[in-house]
Amino acid sequence: CLKPDEEEKTGVARYENVSVRGCHLKRTSRWGIAIGYSYKCKEFMMAELPDELFDRYGHHNIYIADNYVEEIGGDGITVMYAMKPLVEYNSGDSCALEMNDRYYSEPENRGGKVAAGIWPWKSKDALLTYNEMRDMRLNQDSMAWDADSGDGTLYQYNYSHLNEGGCVMFCLEEAIHNEFRYNVSVDDLGGLISPSGNPD
């Protein structure tokens, strides 16, 4: 989203009614599928995300389904700044291939060397269901699922296996009201659940 010069005249730059379905992405660099950054990101710097914020600046009617991402350099699938996004029936295999010191050669520059499988960022009431993620490569996250800095994320009926960072992370203080139920984890490494500074 580009920042509008005259927001009152042109309206807010945001995504509505986006559907990504039936795609096969292979050997991309930083992301497999990502929707959609916001030029108003500073407005979302809080734990409890009010509906009014999404009414004004959030993305609406985001649907990501039946996609397959493999051999991705970073994250598999991420939805950002969205109200009630639905992410279902997606599969990922061998993601985070570039999250290592060959690509991030400065040890003190930790910022970009993180990736997870299928996850929302700064979204509200995100539903992620019937997804599968396998073989997330080791990095500073590397979990299949990541309830990251959002309000009301629900993971249910997902299947993860052989992910080097584990099954799920509840990431940082601004990830609240999350639920993780009826999911199956098989041979995920590095621990099943990572609270990572989460208050819940």
Give residue ranges: language-model regions:
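Right-handed parallel beta-helix
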Residues: 14-30, 43-75, 83-107, 114-117, ...
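Extracellular beta-strand solenoids
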Residues: 2, 35, 79, 120, ...
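Extracellular beta-strand-rich solenoid/capping regions of secreted or surface-exposed proteins
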Residues: 1-13
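Active-site-proximal loop/turn and secondary-structure-junction residues that shape catalytic pockets
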Residues: 4, 37-39, 83
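Extracellular loop and loop/strand-boundary signature of outer-membrane beta-barrel proteins
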Residues: 6-8, 115, 142
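A generic structural signal for short coil/turn motifs at secondary-structure boundaries
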Residues: 9, 76-77, 169
